[in-house]
Amino acid sequence: TLKNGGLVAVDMTNGTKKWTYPTTKGDAYFPIADKNGNVYFTEKGSQTVHAVNASGSKIWEKNVGNNLNYSGGALSTDGILYIGTQSNNKVLGLDITNGNIVFEETVGQQVMAAVSIGPDRRLYCGTIGSNNIGSIKAFAVNKTLATDSWSIRGGDIQGTNRQK
């Protein structure tokens, strides 16, 4: 049993619990697995990104100094985990081998939904600003915001990827 929250791995062949990984503050948000079975996730109510291996053992934990509520990750083919932050309005890129921050960009509003990587290698993130007006922002994955980046305004997209 996970008293405070955490991550549970389930055997997909029979539905039994394989392992658990407890967290200290809250639920595991938006777990994403790489080709080796390593799992990366954020934790509700914390500033920590976790990486665990396919057996449920810790690889690394990284305090990114920003609130990660509602933030999920996108894993690039070059081994970067992109996540959005609620505080400080940033998208961060973490090296999946060690958790070091290798990309950091301020997007101007709270990131309130998982970051996605499109087939065009752009990052897409849902943000929310004043009066709960949401936006979707897109920018190139070239370590800086591209001049041809764009943004679209919509409704309240807190915790979702929906567009009104």
Positions of predicted regions on the chain:
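Extracytoplasmic/lumenal domain signature
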Residues: 1-164
